[in-house]
C-alpha cells in the first residue's frame, strides 16, 4: 500500500509542485504485517515500531506515519457507520524519547523556516546533514512550527484579492462605493450605482470634476474632504452636498419632475422681497452658479426655461401630502380671501428683511431644517405673518360675536315644544 500523503488541494500554492518525498509502495507482505500489528494495538510504542520496521525493511518514521494514517481512516469509517471507536487496547507502550535540539540547531532551523515554510525533501535532507538530526524529525519540527506560528515564515500562501483589495503604497484600499449627488431641479439624494474599482482606475480629476458638477456652490472648507473620501450626508436630505461620483459615462439619475406653480398664489402675488431671501436649502440643476460676494459660492435661482422658481428655502409640495406642523413652526400662510384686497397694500409696506437675514455666510453650513425653524420662530416673522393667518375680516368677526351673544340657545323643553308645533 502506498504511503498516504496530504492531497494537493490541502497544500498552499507554494507547497504544491516542489520536490517532495518519493511515494513509498508497500508490498502485500508488508501490508499484512502492518495490519496484523494494527489489529493488536492501534497505538504501538517506539519499541514495537522499531521491531516491525526491522522485520519488514522499512524505516521506523514511515511505519509511524502509516499507523497515524490508518487510525484516521478507521476513525472516519466508524463515524460514517455510527460505531464507537475502540481506542487504545492494552497497556500504553513507551513513547519515543524527546529529541533534544541545541541552540545552534534551532538557529539553523529558524533561518530555514524564515526563508521557506514548506521545504522540500532536498532542503530537509540538507538541513539534516547540517544539524545532524534525522530528516523525519526535521519534517515534524516544520509541521509543529507552522501549526504554532501560522503567520510567520517566508513564502506564505498568496491571498487572492478583489478589485479594491489594496491601495498604492500599502495603505488602506480606496472606497469602492461612490457618494450621493443631487441631480435635477430638486436633488433626489439617491445613491449612485455601486462601482467596484481598483486604485488608479479612475482619472485623477474625476472625483473633483464630478463633485463640482453636482454641487458647484460648495465652499472650499466643505469641498476639501470630498476628494477621494466620501463624507456622511447631512441629516436632512435636501441640502446641497458633493462627494466622490462615478466618472463620465457612468449611470446617472433621472431628472426630477417639474412641479406646477402653487394653485393659490400667482406669479404676480408673490412677494419679491420674500422670494429673494438667500438660503442654503435651494438646490438648482447642475450648471454654472453665480458667485456671491466676497468670492464665496452662493447658489442662484435656476435659469433654465420652463422651470418655475419657488424662492429660496421653498420646494414643490408632493401631491396629496398633508401639511404636518413641527415643533416651533408656524402654519403656512393661507391664500388671501377676495374681500381682503385692501390688505395687499399693507403687505407691500412690509420692510425688507434685516441685514442679518441677507448674510448667507453664517448659515451656509447649517442644515435647511434648522434655518427654516429659526426663521419661522422669529418674532418679527410671526408679527408680519399674523394678518395672513386671519381668514375673515375683523368687521365680520365682531358681527358674528355680537349675534352669538344676543341669541340664547334653546332649552330642551323649548326644543320639544317647537317640534310638536311643527
From Swiss-Prot:
Residues 1-10 have a biased composition (Polar residues). It is found in: Nucleus. Residues 19-78, 94-153 bind DNA. GO terms for cellular component: chromatin; nucleus. PROSITE patterns: HOMEOBOX_2. SMART domains: HOX. Residues 1-24, 72-102, 148-167, 218-361, 386-412 are annotated as: Disordered. Residues 278-302, 319-329 have a biased composition (Low complexity). Residues 265-274 have a biased composition (Basic and acidic residues). Pfam families: Homeodomain (PF00046). It comes from the Eukaryota. GO terms for biological process: regulation of transcription by RNA polymerase II. One of its GO terms (molecular function) is DNA-binding transcription factor activity, RNA polymerase II-specific. Its main location: nucleus. May be involved in transcriptional regulation. This is Double homeobox protein 4-like protein 4.
Amino acid at each position: 500500500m502506498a504511503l498516504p500523503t496530504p492531497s494537493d488541494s490541502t497544500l498552499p500554492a507554494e507547497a504544491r509542485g516542489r520536490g517532495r518525498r518519493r511515494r513509498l509502495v508497500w508490498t502485500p507482505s508488508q501490508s499484512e504485517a502492518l495490519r496484523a500489528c494494527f489489529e493488536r494495538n492501534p497505538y504501538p510504542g517506539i519499541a514495537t515500531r522499531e521491531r516491525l520496521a526491522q522485520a519488514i525493511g522499512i524505516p521506523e518514521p514511515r511505519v509511524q506515519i502509516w499507523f497515524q494514517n490508518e487510525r484516521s481512516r478507521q476513525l472516519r469509517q466508524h463515524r460514517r457507520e455510527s460505531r464507537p471507536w475502540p481506542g487504545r487496547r492494552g497497556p500504553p507502550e513507551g513513547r519515543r524519547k524527546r529529541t533534544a535540539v541545541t541552540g545552534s540547531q534551532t538557529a539553523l532551523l529558524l533561518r530555514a523556516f524564515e526563508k521557506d515554510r514548506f521545504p522540500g525533501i532536498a532542503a530537509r535532507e540538507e538541513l539534516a546533514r547540517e544539524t545532524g538530526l534525522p530528516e523525519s524529525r526535521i519534517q515534524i519540527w516544520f509541521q509543529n512550527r507552522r501549526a504554532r506560528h501560522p503567520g510567520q515564515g517566508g513564502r506564505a500562501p498568496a491571498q487572492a484579492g478583489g478589485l479594491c483589495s489594496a491601495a498604492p503604497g500599502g495603505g488602506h484600499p480606496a472606497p469602492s462605493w461612490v457618494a450621493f449627488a443631487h441631480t435635477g431641479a430638486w436633488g433626489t439624494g439617491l445613491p449612485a450605482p455601486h462601482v467596484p474599482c481598483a486604485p488608479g482606475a479612475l482619472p485623477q480629476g474625476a472625483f473633483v470634476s464630478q463633485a463640482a458638477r453636482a454641487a458647484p456652490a460648495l465652499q472650499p472648507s466643505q469641498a476639501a474632504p470630498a476628494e477621494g473620501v466620501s463624507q456622511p450626508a447631512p441629516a436632512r436630505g435636501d441640502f446641497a452636498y458633493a462627494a466622490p461620483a462615478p466618472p463620465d459615462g457612468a449611470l446617472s439619475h433621472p431628472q426630477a419632475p417639474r412641479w406646477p406653480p402653487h394653485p393659490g398664489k400667482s406669479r404676480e402675488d408673490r412677494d419679491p422681497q420674500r422670494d429673494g431671501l438667500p438660503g442654503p436649502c435651494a438646490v438648482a440643476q447642475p450648471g454654472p452658479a453665480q458667485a456671491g460676494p466676497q468670492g464665496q459660492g452662493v447658489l442662484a435661482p435656476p435659469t433654465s426655461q420652463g422651470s418655475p422658481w419657488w424662492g429660496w428655502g421653498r420646494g414643490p409640495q408632493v401631491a396629496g401630502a398633508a401639511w404636518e406642523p413641527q415643533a416651533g413652526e408656524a402654519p403656512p400662510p393661507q391664500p388671501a380671501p377676495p374681500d381682503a384686497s385692501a390688505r395687499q397694500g399693507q403687505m407691500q409696506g412690509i420692510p425688507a428683511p434685516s441685514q442679518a437675514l441677507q448674510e448667507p455666510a453664517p448659515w451656509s453650513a447649517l442644515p435647511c431644517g434648522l434655518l427654516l425653524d429659526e426663521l419661522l420662530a422669529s418674532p418679527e416673522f410671526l408679527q408680519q405673518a399674523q394678518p395672513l393667518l386671519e381668514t375673515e375680516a375683523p368687521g365680520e368677526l365682531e358681527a358674528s360675536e355680537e349675534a352669538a351673544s344676543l341669541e340664547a340657545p334653546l332649552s330642551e323643553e323649548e326644543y320639544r315644544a317647537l317640534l310638536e308645533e311643527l
